[in-house]
Protein backbone atom coordinates (compact mmCIF):
# COMPACT_ATOMS: atom_id res chain seq x y z
CA UNK A 1 0.00 0.00 0.00
CA UNK A 2 1.28 3.47 -0.96
CA UNK A 3 0.70 6.42 1.37
CA UNK A 4 1.79 10.03 0.92
CA UNK A 5 2.31 12.17 4.00
CA UNK A 6 2.89 15.89 4.31
CA UNK A 7 6.18 16.79 5.99
CA UNK A 8 5.88 18.73 9.22
CA UNK A 9 8.69 21.20 8.58
CA UNK A 10 8.86 22.08 12.28
CA UNK A 11 9.69 18.44 13.10
CA UNK A 12 13.39 17.64 12.93
CA UNK A 13 12.55 13.96 12.47
CA UNK A 14 10.27 14.63 9.49
CA UNK A 15 12.75 16.99 7.87
CA UNK A 16 15.62 14.52 8.23
CA UNK A 17 13.54 11.79 6.62
CA UNK A 18 12.81 14.04 3.65
CA UNK A 19 16.44 15.16 3.35
CA UNK A 20 17.78 11.62 3.58
CA UNK A 21 15.79 9.95 0.78
CA UNK A 22 18.20 10.65 -2.13
CA UNK A 23 21.16 9.53 -0.04
CA UNK A 24 19.55 6.08 -0.05
CA UNK A 25 18.43 6.09 -3.68
CA UNK A 26 21.82 7.19 -5.08
CA UNK A 27 24.14 5.52 -2.59
CA UNK A 28 25.79 3.45 -5.34
CA UNK A 29 25.61 6.06 -8.12
CA UNK A 30 29.04 7.53 -9.06
CA UNK A 31 27.53 10.41 -11.07
CA UNK A 32 25.40 11.75 -8.22
CA UNK A 33 26.80 14.59 -6.09
CA UNK A 34 25.23 14.79 -2.62
CA UNK A 35 23.86 18.18 -1.62
CA UNK A 36 24.80 19.63 1.71
CA UNK A 37 22.07 18.44 4.04
CA UNK A 38 22.02 21.86 5.71
CA UNK A 39 21.11 23.49 2.38
CA UNK A 40 18.07 21.25 1.94
CA UNK A 41 17.01 21.81 5.55
CA UNK A 42 17.11 25.55 4.87
CA UNK A 43 14.80 25.11 1.88
CA UNK A 44 12.24 23.61 4.26
CA UNK A 45 12.73 26.27 6.92
CA UNK A 46 10.15 29.05 6.68
CA UNK A 47 12.11 31.21 9.11
CA UNK A 48 15.41 31.06 7.22
CA UNK A 49 14.76 30.95 3.47
CA UNK A 50 13.79 34.29 1.84
CA UNK A 51 11.46 32.50 -0.61
CA UNK A 52 8.85 32.31 2.16
CA UNK A 53 8.74 36.09 2.51
CA UNK A 54 6.58 36.19 -0.62
CA UNK A 55 5.65 32.58 -1.44
CA UNK A 56 4.77 29.17 -0.03
CA UNK A 57 5.73 25.51 -0.28
CA UNK A 58 4.89 22.10 1.15
CA UNK A 59 6.70 18.79 1.03
CA UNK A 60 5.56 15.18 0.80
CA UNK A 61 7.04 11.73 1.41
CA UNK A 62 5.72 8.54 -0.20
CA UNK A 63 5.84 5.26 1.69
CA UNK A 64 5.04 1.77 0.51
CA UNK A 65 4.44 -0.75 3.27
CA UNK A 66 6.17 1.66 5.64
CA UNK A 67 9.32 2.12 3.54
CA UNK A 68 10.21 5.58 2.21
CA UNK A 69 10.17 5.33 -1.59
CA UNK A 70 9.88 8.91 -2.84
CA UNK A 71 9.52 12.58 -2.07
CA UNK A 72 8.45 15.84 -3.72
CA UNK A 73 8.14 19.55 -3.00
CA UNK A 74 5.21 21.71 -4.16
CA UNK A 75 5.93 25.43 -4.53
CA UNK A 76 3.87 28.50 -5.30
CA UNK A 77 6.18 31.33 -6.34
CA UNK A 78 3.77 34.24 -6.11
CA UNK A 79 6.38 36.76 -7.19
CA UNK A 80 7.07 34.79 -10.39
CA UNK A 81 3.37 34.37 -11.07
CA UNK A 82 2.68 38.08 -10.57
CA UNK A 83 5.51 39.06 -12.92
CA UNK A 84 4.39 36.65 -15.66
CA UNK A 85 0.63 36.90 -14.99
CA UNK A 86 0.55 33.12 -14.57
CA UNK A 87 -1.01 30.64 -12.15
CA UNK A 88 1.73 28.05 -11.85
CA UNK A 89 2.68 25.62 -9.16
CA UNK A 90 6.20 24.25 -9.28
CA UNK A 91 7.50 20.84 -8.30
CA UNK A 92 11.02 20.39 -7.00
CA UNK A 93 13.19 17.95 -5.03
CA UNK A 94 11.40 15.06 -6.74
CA UNK A 95 12.94 11.65 -6.06
CA UNK A 96 11.33 8.28 -6.64
CA UNK A 97 12.05 4.61 -7.04
CA UNK A 98 11.32 3.10 -10.47
CA UNK A 99 7.60 2.77 -9.86
CA UNK A 100 4.87 4.61 -11.78
CA UNK A 101 2.32 4.22 -8.98
CA UNK A 102 4.61 5.87 -6.44
CA UNK A 103 5.24 8.76 -8.84
CA UNK A 104 1.50 9.07 -9.51
CA UNK A 105 0.72 9.19 -5.78
CA UNK A 106 3.29 11.93 -5.19
CA UNK A 107 2.14 14.08 -8.10
CA UNK A 108 -1.52 13.64 -7.21
CA UNK A 109 -0.74 15.35 -3.91
CA UNK A 110 0.97 18.18 -5.79
CA UNK A 111 -2.03 18.53 -8.13
CA UNK A 112 -4.43 18.66 -5.15
CA UNK A 113 -2.21 21.20 -3.40
CA UNK A 114 -2.08 23.40 -6.51
CA UNK A 115 -5.81 23.26 -7.26
CA UNK A 116 -6.62 24.24 -3.69
CA UNK A 117 -4.66 27.46 -4.32
CA UNK A 118 -6.39 28.25 -7.60
CA UNK A 119 -3.38 27.29 -9.72
CA UNK A 120 -3.94 25.72 -13.14
CA UNK A 121 -0.63 24.20 -14.20
CA UNK A 122 2.37 22.47 -12.68
CA UNK A 123 5.91 23.15 -13.91
CA UNK A 124 9.23 21.70 -12.89
CA UNK A 125 11.60 20.74 -11.58
CA UNK A 126 12.04 24.39 -10.66
CA UNK A 127 13.36 25.47 -7.30
CA UNK A 128 13.35 28.29 -4.80
CA UNK A 129 15.45 30.66 -6.89
CA UNK A 130 17.01 30.85 -10.36
CA UNK A 131 20.23 29.51 -8.83
CA UNK A 132 18.85 26.11 -7.83
CA UNK A 133 19.18 24.51 -11.27
CA UNK A 134 16.41 23.31 -13.52
CA UNK A 135 14.89 20.22 -14.95
CA UNK A 136 14.94 16.46 -15.05
CA UNK A 137 18.02 15.13 -16.77
CA UNK A 138 17.13 13.55 -20.11
CA UNK A 139 20.59 13.19 -21.71
CA UNK A 140 24.16 12.72 -20.50
CA UNK A 141 23.56 10.31 -17.64
CA UNK A 142 27.12 9.00 -17.88
CA UNK A 143 28.52 12.38 -16.82
CA UNK A 144 28.92 13.52 -13.25
CA UNK A 145 26.58 16.15 -11.89
CA UNK A 146 28.06 19.67 -11.69
CA UNK A 147 28.00 20.32 -7.96
CA UNK A 148 24.61 21.66 -6.79
CA UNK A 149 24.12 23.72 -9.93
CA UNK A 150 21.92 21.07 -11.52
CA UNK A 151 20.04 17.90 -10.73
CA UNK A 152 21.15 14.35 -11.44
CA UNK A 153 18.58 11.60 -11.79
CA UNK A 154 18.31 8.07 -13.11
CA UNK A 155 17.38 7.54 -16.76
CA UNK A 156 13.87 6.31 -15.90
CA UNK A 157 12.76 9.66 -14.43
CA UNK A 158 11.58 11.22 -17.74
CA UNK A 159 9.32 8.21 -18.30
CA UNK A 160 7.81 8.64 -14.83
CA UNK A 161 6.70 12.23 -15.43
CA UNK A 162 5.77 11.82 -19.10
CA UNK A 163 3.56 8.90 -18.08
CA UNK A 164 1.58 11.37 -15.96
CA UNK A 165 0.85 13.69 -18.88
CA UNK A 166 3.72 16.12 -18.49
CA UNK A 167 5.15 17.65 -21.67
CA UNK A 168 8.33 19.54 -22.45
CA UNK A 169 8.35 23.22 -21.50
CA UNK A 170 12.02 24.14 -22.04
CA UNK A 171 15.41 22.43 -22.14
CA UNK A 172 18.56 23.64 -20.40
CA UNK A 173 21.70 22.50 -22.22
CA UNK A 174 25.13 22.13 -20.61
CA UNK A 175 28.12 22.12 -22.94
CA UNK A 176 31.61 20.73 -22.53
CA UNK A 177 34.87 22.36 -23.58
CA UNK A 178 38.20 20.58 -23.69
CA UNK A 179 40.41 23.55 -23.01
CA UNK A 180 43.41 22.25 -24.94
CA UNK A 181 41.29 22.46 -28.09
CA UNK A 182 39.48 25.70 -27.24
CA UNK A 183 40.59 28.82 -29.06
CA UNK A 184 38.58 31.98 -29.51
CA UNK A 185 39.46 33.41 -32.95
CA UNK A 186 41.67 36.48 -32.90
CA UNK A 187 38.99 38.49 -34.70
CA UNK A 188 36.69 38.08 -31.66
CA UNK A 189 39.40 39.44 -29.38
CA UNK A 190 39.82 42.39 -31.79
CA UNK A 191 36.07 43.06 -31.82
CA UNK A 192 36.08 42.90 -28.01
CA UNK A 193 38.82 45.52 -27.79
CA UNK A 194 36.99 47.82 -30.22
CA UNK A 195 33.76 47.47 -28.25
CA UNK A 196 35.55 48.34 -25.02
CA UNK A 197 36.98 51.52 -26.53
CA UNK A 198 33.88 52.66 -28.42
CA UNK A 199 31.46 52.05 -25.58
CA UNK A 200 33.76 53.02 -22.74
CA UNK A 201 33.70 49.55 -21.18
CA UNK A 202 36.18 48.10 -18.73
CA UNK A 203 36.55 44.60 -17.29
CA UNK A 204 37.04 44.26 -13.55
CA UNK A 205 38.42 41.16 -11.83
CA UNK A 206 38.31 40.54 -8.10
CA UNK A 207 41.22 40.08 -5.77
CA UNK A 208 39.46 38.73 -2.69
CA UNK A 209 36.15 37.49 -1.34
CA UNK A 210 35.94 40.62 0.79
CA UNK A 211 36.06 42.77 -2.35
CA UNK A 212 33.48 40.52 -4.00
CA UNK A 213 31.11 40.99 -1.05
CA UNK A 214 31.35 44.77 -1.43
CA UNK A 215 29.95 44.45 -4.95
CA UNK A 216 26.91 42.43 -3.88
CA UNK A 217 24.36 45.16 -4.53
CA UNK A 218 25.69 46.04 -7.96
CA UNK A 219 25.93 42.41 -9.07
CA UNK A 220 22.37 41.76 -7.88
CA UNK A 221 21.09 44.82 -9.74
CA UNK A 222 22.89 43.63 -12.89
CA UNK A 223 21.23 40.22 -12.61
CA UNK A 224 17.81 41.84 -12.35
CA UNK A 225 18.55 43.81 -15.56
CA UNK A 226 20.27 41.12 -17.61
CA UNK A 227 17.83 38.21 -17.67
CA UNK A 228 14.51 40.03 -17.98
CA UNK A 229 13.69 38.20 -21.23
CA UNK A 230 14.53 34.74 -19.90
CA UNK A 231 11.81 32.15 -19.39
CA UNK A 232 12.76 31.59 -15.75
CA UNK A 233 13.19 35.25 -14.76
CA UNK A 234 11.46 37.13 -11.99
CA UNK A 235 12.85 40.12 -10.08
CA UNK A 236 14.67 38.90 -6.99
CA UNK A 237 14.14 40.67 -3.68
CA UNK A 238 17.07 42.21 -1.84
CA UNK A 239 16.97 39.38 0.72
CA UNK A 240 16.99 36.76 -2.06
CA UNK A 241 20.03 38.44 -3.60
CA UNK A 242 21.76 38.51 -0.19
CA UNK A 243 20.97 34.82 0.34
CA UNK A 244 22.19 33.75 -3.12
CA UNK A 245 25.27 35.94 -2.89
CA UNK A 246 26.33 34.34 0.38
CA UNK A 247 26.35 30.95 -1.35
CA UNK A 248 28.14 32.38 -4.39
CA UNK A 249 30.95 33.82 -2.29
CA UNK A 250 31.45 30.56 -0.41
CA UNK A 251 31.86 28.60 -3.66
CA UNK A 252 33.81 31.25 -5.55
CA UNK A 253 37.41 31.77 -6.44
CA UNK A 254 37.39 35.56 -6.88
CA UNK A 255 39.83 35.30 -9.80
CA UNK A 256 37.10 33.51 -11.79
CA UNK A 257 34.49 36.27 -11.35
CA UNK A 258 34.55 39.17 -13.82
CA UNK A 259 32.23 42.10 -14.40
CA UNK A 260 31.97 44.44 -17.37
CA UNK A 261 31.59 48.08 -16.32
CA UNK A 262 30.35 51.24 -17.98
CA UNK A 263 30.68 54.40 -15.92
CA UNK A 264 30.86 52.29 -12.78
CA UNK A 265 27.71 50.29 -13.51
CA UNK A 266 27.79 46.56 -14.23
CA UNK A 267 26.53 45.80 -17.74
CA UNK A 268 27.83 42.22 -18.01
CA UNK A 269 29.39 39.45 -15.97
CA UNK A 270 31.09 36.07 -16.09
CA UNK A 271 30.70 33.82 -13.06
CA UNK A 272 33.20 30.98 -12.96
CA UNK A 273 33.42 28.36 -10.23
CA UNK A 274 35.97 25.64 -9.52
CA UNK A 275 34.19 22.29 -9.72
CA UNK A 276 34.35 20.74 -6.26
CA UNK A 277 32.00 17.85 -7.06
CA UNK A 278 34.54 15.25 -5.94
CA UNK A 279 34.97 17.03 -2.62
CA UNK A 280 31.20 17.17 -2.16
CA UNK A 281 30.98 13.45 -2.84
CA UNK A 282 33.57 12.78 -0.17
CA UNK A 283 31.80 15.13 2.24
CA UNK A 284 28.58 13.13 1.67
CA UNK A 285 26.28 15.95 2.69
CA UNK A 286 28.07 17.22 5.80
CA UNK A 287 30.74 19.86 6.37
CA UNK A 288 31.81 18.27 9.66
CA UNK A 289 34.00 16.66 10.74
CA UNK A 290 36.00 16.49 7.46
CA UNK A 291 33.59 17.56 4.74
CA UNK A 292 34.80 21.15 4.55
CA UNK A 293 38.40 19.97 4.30
CA UNK A 294 37.52 17.70 1.35
CA UNK A 295 35.81 20.60 -0.43
CA UNK A 296 38.68 23.05 0.17
CA UNK A 297 41.25 20.54 -1.04
CA UNK A 298 39.22 19.85 -4.16
CA UNK A 299 38.94 23.58 -4.82
CA UNK A 300 42.74 23.68 -5.13
CA UNK A 301 43.14 20.43 -7.07
CA UNK A 302 40.21 20.35 -9.47
CA UNK A 303 40.83 20.41 -13.22
CA UNK A 304 37.25 21.46 -13.99
CA UNK A 305 35.64 24.89 -14.08
CA UNK A 306 31.93 25.65 -14.34
CA UNK A 307 30.75 28.82 -16.04
CA UNK A 308 27.29 29.33 -14.60
CA UNK A 309 26.20 32.89 -15.17
CA UNK A 310 27.39 34.57 -18.35
CA UNK A 311 25.31 37.57 -19.31
CA UNK A 312 25.16 41.09 -20.66
CA UNK A 313 22.38 43.64 -20.32
CA UNK A 314 19.97 43.72 -23.28
CA UNK A 315 21.11 47.09 -24.67
CA UNK A 316 24.62 45.70 -25.31
CA UNK A 317 23.54 42.39 -26.81
CA UNK A 318 24.17 42.26 -30.55
CA UNK A 319 26.44 45.33 -30.39
CA UNK A 320 29.67 43.44 -29.85
CA UNK A 321 28.86 42.71 -26.23
CA UNK A 322 28.78 38.97 -26.80
CA UNK A 323 32.24 39.10 -28.41
CA UNK A 324 33.53 40.80 -25.27
CA UNK A 325 32.00 38.07 -23.10
CA UNK A 326 33.55 35.28 -25.19
CA UNK A 327 36.94 36.98 -25.19
CA UNK A 328 36.92 37.34 -21.42
CA UNK A 329 35.51 33.84 -20.98
CA UNK A 330 38.49 32.42 -22.87
CA UNK A 331 40.91 34.38 -20.70
CA UNK A 332 39.16 33.06 -17.59
CA UNK A 333 39.12 29.36 -18.44
CA UNK A 334 42.62 29.37 -19.95
CA UNK A 335 44.24 31.33 -17.15
CA UNK A 336 46.95 30.18 -14.77
CA UNK A 337 44.83 27.95 -12.51
CA UNK A 338 45.48 24.73 -14.43
CA UNK A 339 41.98 23.89 -15.63
CA UNK A 340 41.71 21.18 -18.28
CA UNK A 341 37.93 20.93 -18.68
CA UNK A 342 35.12 23.49 -18.65
CA UNK A 343 31.36 23.23 -18.49
CA UNK A 344 28.95 25.97 -19.46
CA UNK A 345 26.20 25.00 -17.10
CA UNK A 346 22.52 25.03 -18.07
CA UNK A 347 22.06 27.53 -20.91
CA UNK A 348 18.38 27.72 -21.85
CA UNK A 349 17.60 26.51 -25.35
CA UNK A 350 15.83 29.84 -25.92
CA UNK A 351 19.27 31.55 -25.83
CA UNK A 352 19.68 30.54 -29.47
CA UNK A 353 22.47 32.94 -30.44
CA UNK A 354 24.64 32.15 -27.42
CA UNK A 355 24.24 28.41 -27.91
CA UNK A 356 25.09 28.72 -31.61
CA UNK A 357 28.15 30.85 -30.83
CA UNK A 358 29.38 28.39 -28.20
CA UNK A 359 29.10 25.44 -30.58
CA UNK A 360 30.98 27.42 -33.25
CA UNK A 361 33.71 28.02 -30.68
CA UNK A 362 34.04 24.28 -30.05
CA UNK A 363 31.70 23.66 -27.12
CA UNK A 364 29.86 20.34 -27.31
CA UNK A 365 26.38 19.77 -25.83
CA UNK A 366 26.69 16.86 -23.41
CA UNK A 367 23.93 17.18 -20.79
CA UNK A 368 20.29 18.13 -21.17
CA UNK A 369 17.83 18.94 -18.39
CA UNK A 370 14.16 19.29 -19.28
CA UNK A 371 11.56 21.36 -17.48
CA UNK A 372 8.10 19.81 -17.83
CA UNK A 373 4.63 21.32 -17.71
CA UNK A 374 1.13 19.93 -17.24
CA UNK A 375 -2.25 21.63 -17.10
CA UNK A 376 -4.43 20.59 -14.17
Regions found by a protein language model. Give the residues of each.
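Short beta-strand-to-coil "C-cap" segments at the C-terminal boundary of structured domains/repeats
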Residues: 1, 177-180, 373-376
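TRNA-binding/sensing appendages of the translation machinery
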Residues: 1-42, 111
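A conserved beta-strand-loop-helix scaffold within acyl/acetyltransferase catalytic domains
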Residues: 22-64, 72-82, 211-311
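Acyl-donor binding region in acyl/amide transferases
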Residues: 81-165, 283-361
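Acyltransferase donor/substrate-recognition loop-hinge adjacent to the catalytic core
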Residues: 151-232
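Active-site proximal loops enriched in glycine and acidic residues that flank catalytic Cys/His/Asp
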Residues: 261-264, 270-276, 308-314, 325, ...
Amino acid sequence: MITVERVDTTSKKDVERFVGIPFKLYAECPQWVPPLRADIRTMLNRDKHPFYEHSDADFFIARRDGEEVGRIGALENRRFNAYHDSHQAQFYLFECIHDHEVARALFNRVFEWARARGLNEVVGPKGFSPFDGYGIQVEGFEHRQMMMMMNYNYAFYPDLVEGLGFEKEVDFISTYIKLADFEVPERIHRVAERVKKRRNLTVHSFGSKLELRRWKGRIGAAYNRTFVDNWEYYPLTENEIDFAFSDLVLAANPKLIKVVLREGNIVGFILGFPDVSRGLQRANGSLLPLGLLHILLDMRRTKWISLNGVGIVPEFQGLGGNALLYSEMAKTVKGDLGFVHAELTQVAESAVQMRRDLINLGAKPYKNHRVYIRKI
